[in-house]
Regions:
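C-terminal motif of bacterial Sec signal peptides marking the signal peptidase cleavage site
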Residues: 17-20
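Sec-dependent N-terminal signal peptides
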Residues: 7-13
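Acidic/histidine-rich, surface-exposed loop or edge segments in extracytoplasmic proteins
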Residues: 41-48, 108-117
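A cross-family detector of function-defining hotspots
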Residues: 62-102, 124, 129-170
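Second-shell loop/turn segments in exported
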Residues: 48-54, 116-123
Length: 182
């Protein structure tokens, strides 16, 4: 089961990296309606792990020093969306992905890997769409099988199949410094 979770984490992490390098043409262009990430207010979305509140674009080094050694290991790769390296920390049931900004490691995404953990609002993998909407409201975008909520510089993504949560992530909304993907 652990091997399966690690494989799923690797696939999801690769998907997040590739999404940063790909087109977002399936999402509506709301650029006129919303300020760019650097001008946005702080996000209301966060995730708590081992009593530590994790927020996207927060200090990844601080978070990982408090969380300790990741049980599933650590991986890094040259970033195709940001300067420097992308970093992946595989904790029980949660994957943290980091990126470098101005020479500092920042938290890019938090991905919940199984139903052992839940959001502060009580939503976990396996819950129905009705529970997501009840917890987070109806102000979401539905695209590519996902329910997408945005607040400040954070996108909360629920991947759905048959109206059931398959995966959920908090992702930092930012403008990549330059794309180096092929």
């Amino acid at each position: 089961m652990r091997k399966k979770s690690l494989m799923l984490a690797a696939v999801l992490a690769a998907g997040v990296m590739m999404a940063a390098c790909g087109s977002t043409s399936t999402l509506p262009d709301n650029s006129q309606d919303k300020p760019v990430a650097s001008q946005q207010t702080e996000s209301k979305y966060s995730f708590e792990l081992k009593g530590i509140e994790l927020k996207t674009d927060g200090d990844l080094t601080e978070y990982t020093s408090k969380l300790g050694e990741p049980s599933g290991g650590y991986y890094e790769a040259k970033s195709c969306a940001f300067e420097g390296m992308d970093k992946f920390y595989y904790y029980d049931s949660v994957t943290l992905q980091g990126y470098q900004k101005d020479g500092n490691d920042k938290l890019y995404s938090i991905t919940l890997m199984d139903d052992a953990v839940k959001t502060k609002e009580g939503v976990r993998i396996g819950d129905k769409k009705d529970k997501v909407v009840s917890a987070y409201g109806s102000d979401y975008t539905e695209a590519d099988g996902q329910l997408l909520y945005e607040s400040g510089n954070t996108r909360l993504s629920f991947v759905m199949k048959d109206d059931e949560v398959q995966s959920l992530s908090l992702i930092h909304i930012s403008e990549p410094t330059r794309l180096r993907c092929i």
